[in-house]
Curated annotation (Swiss-Prot):
Has 3 domains, the large (RuvB-L) and small ATPase (RuvB-S) domains and the C-terminal head (RuvB-H) domain. The head domain binds DNA, while the ATPase domains jointly bind ATP, ADP or are empty depending on the state of the subunit in the translocation cycle. During a single DNA translocation step the structure of each domain remains the same, but their relative positions change. Residues 27-207 are annotated as: Large ATPase domain (RuvB-L). Residues 208-278 are annotated as: Small ATPAse domain (RuvB-S). Belongs to the RuvB family. This is Holliday junction branch migration complex subunit RuvB. It comes from Corynebacterium glutamicum (strain R). Keywords: ATP-binding, Cytoplasm, DNA damage, DNA recombination, DNA repair, DNA-binding, Hydrolase, Nucleotide-binding. Coiled coil: none annotated. Its main location: cytoplasm. DNA binds at R336, R341.
Amino acid sequence: MSDVERTEFEIPGGIPPRRNGGQGRAADTNVDANLKPDEYDAEVTLRPKSLTEFIGQPKVRDQLSLVLTGAKNRGVVPDHVLLSGPPGLGKTTMAMIIAQELGTSLRMTSGPALERAGDLAAMLSNLMEGDVLFIDEIHRIARPAEEMLYMAMEDFRIDVIVGKGPGATSIPLEIPPFTLVGATTRSGMLTGPLRDRFGFTAQMEFYDVPDLTKVVKRTAKILDVGIDNDAAVEIASRSRGTPRIANRLLRRVRDFAEVHADGHITMGAANAALIVFDVDEVGLDRLDRAVLDALIRGHGGGPVGVNTLAVAVGEEPGTVEEVCEPYLVRAGMIARTGRGRVATAAAWRHLGLEPPEGTIGDY
């Protein structure tokens, strides 16, 4: 029997055991949905180029198709578009597709990069008619730039201030009609005036396993990697409903299959690789389990404040709150209460422990 047919693999040094505790760094996790700097080039090659090629998000795709087709038929630029949702679900890809579908150029920037009104004015003055301007993390745009954006979105003009003090003058500058696509992971942080200027808003949802399986298979085809269906399902089921994580895990499993087998990804190769990279059967990694361990073994299941949990696992509070906690809450393993975070019965059982009587979710 060849290595690729086995369900067990011999790895130099052995497969590291899963630990329910221990420390983890956000930069090392394979299940952080934020884009890592060294992943940009890989992501570009994997992005779909059209709405029909885009997998998942059927409601958003159908709505956007209507908006774009209607605008093209009328010969006008589409309304400004706001895409909301957690990282890794395809907001940037959707902005690229919008420009592709319209046959126009895409200009990209981010909210944190627009610190002054002049930064935004420079970008707007270089737009051509019909261009798509994509602002990622638009909720982080500086107030002076945001106020300039109001007029640009509504009237396609801006006022440029020349000079300082009493001698300063305002020069109106017409800009070509354009479509702004804003992306945000925190739509609640958008000001009302900015949110109201978007003609179309869409909420990107987490993916189910069937759609994520399609994503894994499509990526494997692009990467020229053979993969069995059950292996694709296994990778998808551990990807937290997020295509970016699914693609990252597939690349790690590919590495394993190339080193320890013949490069073809079987169920055995997928399982063994995900053990090596410390991603368990429900998508938790070492840091997630360390948080649960600190909450349950260290504090009896809570309630515990996020700062205390962060100290216990050796992480920054922001990392625990933004990287770990959202998925643990969505997976039903942590509940937020007025007094702090509380472990649910599912969390106790995930660590192989019996939950005390009265634990949340213990029916």
